[in-house]
């Protein structure tokens, strides 16, 4: 039996306790772990493979302008843990706050696992949670697919 790593959630962001949560994951054979890590950790690459991103310290995502701050960065030989908190400057019903976490993990048999999960709070998060098709779920899958293709 094999156990894979999991996101380490701060208490405020525990999935199911916020207004919106999505999880996307791929496991790909023959992908270079170091390329994936480089293309994810360096935000200047993002627009080359993910159309729903822009700017570095502040970015627009799903129609919201969000400031961002890295909350976790840990790179070891076989795993990258990366997470950031984002928020907008709006008040009341327009306020949105997010915690977006990633794991890139080198697995046996020449496989790489990429896991991304996002937990959100605020009225906009509630609306995103109800969207059909789910814009955040599909957007993050496009991010994963783009990251994989760009890293090949």
Language model features: what each stretch is:
Residues 1-56:
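Hydrophobic ligand-binding cavity/cleft-lining segments
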Residues 2, 47-48, 52, 60-113, ...:
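Hydrophobic-ligand binding "helix-grip"
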Residues 5, 9, 42, 80-83, ...:
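Acidic, low-complexity intrinsically disordered regions
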Residues 21, 30-31, 89, 128-132:
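Residue-level detector of alpha-helix boundaries and kinks
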Residues 113-115, 119-152:
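A conserved amphipathic terminal alpha-helix motif
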